[in-house]
């Protein structure tokens, strides 16, 4: 169950797309870079269960952990997750364990992208500027699209109200120096996973976001995903004012997470 890095066609406005439109392609970097992952307390799990974020390359041990997760089994006990959080500077938000910075120097276990420069990552989050890497290779792998949240939550889990608040405070964000067409898709299937260039995904039905926007100094970052099971593509580019979210109630992807609608975009079924 090796992941495939997908290279979208020539740069064009960001759109939702299905995997069958593109041929899987692996790069040398994806074979040589290890796969970082974040521990996630899943919003649909019990207190003793968690989820894991897939990284750039998937190894058998990590795939085994994902299968355990899908079966409702946690790869880490709650105490271990709490220890990781306190030791490596994480804080819990609904369904997501976020590092206090993009790549904390003390975090060697799981949350650091291999291309990340610690000082640059700190500056990027503190000053709200783009993540600038020192080499062409690093610039390539620093590319990705993310979403951010202003809200802070405790360790007790989520409520519907908290989830609505988190979504209401979610904004689109671009990361690094990458073409607008580079983004990630992830399968819902256990057996197939895929990543775009240098991106991470919380879960198959994660909130999606678009491009643009600058982070505020206090914003924490995680990564967006794009469903591979859309029935039709988005009708226009996604912008910071026009982002997409998953509605569990109506089982639709909506183009604006706050209002469920956006000019020029229609809901797309999953």
UniProtKB/Swiss-Prot annotation:
The gene is IKBKE-AS1. This is Putative uncharacterized protein IKBKE-AS1. Residues 22-31 have a biased composition (Basic and acidic residues). Residues 22-42 are annotated as: Disordered. It comes from the Eukaryota.
């Amino acid at each position: 169950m090796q992941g495939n890095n997908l290279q979208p066609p020539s740069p064009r406005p960001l759109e939702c797309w299905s995997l069958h439109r593109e041929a899987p392609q692996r790069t040398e970097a994806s074979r040589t870079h290890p796969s970082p992952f974040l521990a996630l307390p899943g919003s649909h799990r019990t207190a003793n269960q968690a989820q894991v974020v897939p990284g750039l390359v998937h190894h058998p041990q990590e795939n085994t952990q994902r299968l355990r997760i899908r079966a409702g089994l946690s790869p880490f006990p709650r105490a271990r997750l709490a220890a990781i959080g306190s030791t490596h500077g994480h804080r819990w938000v609904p369904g997501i364990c976020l590092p206090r910075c993009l790549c904390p120097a003390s975090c060697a276990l799981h949350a650091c992208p291999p291309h990340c420069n610690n000082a640059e990552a700190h500056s990027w989050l503190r000053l709200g500027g783009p993540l600038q890497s020192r080499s062409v290779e690093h610039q390539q792998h620093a590319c990705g699209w993310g979403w951010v949240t202003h809200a802070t939550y405790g360790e007790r889990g989520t409520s519907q109200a908290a989830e609505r608040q988190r979504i209401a405070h979610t904004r689109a964000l671009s990361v690094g120096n990458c073409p607008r067409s580079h983004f990630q898709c992830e399968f819902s299937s256990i057996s197939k996973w895929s990543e775009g260039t240098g991106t991470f995904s919380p879960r198959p039905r994660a909130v999606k976001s678009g491009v643009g926007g600058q982070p505020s100094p206090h914003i924490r970052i995680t990564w967006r995903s794009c469903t591979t099971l859309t029935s039709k593509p988005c009708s226009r580019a996604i912008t910071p004012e026009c982002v997409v979210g998953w509605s569990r109630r109506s089982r639709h992807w909506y183009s604006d997470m706050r209002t469920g609608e956006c000019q020029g975009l229609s809901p797309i079924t999953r």
